[in-house]
Amino acid sequence: MNFENCFPLWNDLNTAQKKIISNNLITQYVKKGTIIHNGNLDCTGLLLVKSGQLRTYILSDEGREITLYRLFDMDMCLLSASCMMRSIQFEVTIEAEKDTDLWIIPAEIYKGIMKESAPVANYTNELMATRFSDVMWLMEQIMWKSLDKRVASFLLEETSIEETNELKITHETIANHLGSHREVITRMLRYFQSEGLVKLSRGKITILDSKRLETLQRL
C-alpha cells in the first residue's frame, strides 16, 4: 500500500509538490500505548494512518481524559499540526490504541503546499470543520446525555470496531474515553450486569443483549 494511493490529494498536486512531500515524508511504526503527539508543545505534522488505530483526547484541569475521536485506516489528523494554524489553540494528545503504521507530513512542508494549492487548502478546511463538528457533537453528548446512554453507546461502538461481543477492556479505559471516573463506570457496568445486558470478568466485558443496549442509547 503506497502513500500515493492513500493520500486523497495526491492527484491534485503538481510534480514539484509531489517531490517535496516524497522527500520529506516520514514513515513510522508505533506500538500500542505510544504517545504520538502531546499538546501544543508538539508540532508533529499531518498524520495519515496506514493501518492501526489512534485515539485523540484532551485532559481536564483535574487530569481526566476524554476521547474526542478515533482514527482508523486511511484517516487523516490535522490537530497534530495545529501549530501551523495560528487561530487554533487546541491542546490534544494522540495515542496509539493499537500497533499502528502511519505516514507523517511535517507541518512546515504541509503548510507550504497548502499556501500554494487551493485544493489542498479547501480540503484542509473541510477536514478541520468535520473534526470540530465531531467535537461539538461530543460536547452535546456530555452535556445532555445521561451516563448510562453514553456507556451503552460506547460498548456498542466497541463491538462494532472489534467485531466481537467479548471486549478486552478495563473500566479505567472506558472512564478515560468518556471523561468519567473509574468507580462511576464500575457502578454503571454492575447495574448493566444486574439487568442482564453484560457479563463482567477481569479485564473483559461480554455483551449479552445488544438490542436492549441499542434501545437504551436511543431513549
Regions found by a protein language model. Give the residues of each.
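Cyclic-nucleotide recognition modules
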Residues: 69-125
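Short phosphate-coordinating micro-motif centered on Lys-Gly-acidic
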Residues: 36-41
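Cyclic nucleotide-binding regulatory module and flanking cytosolic helices
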Residues: 1-31, 71, 76, 81-85
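Glycine- and acidic-residue-biased ligand/ion/polar-headgroup-sensing regions
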Residues: 33, 44-57, 72-74
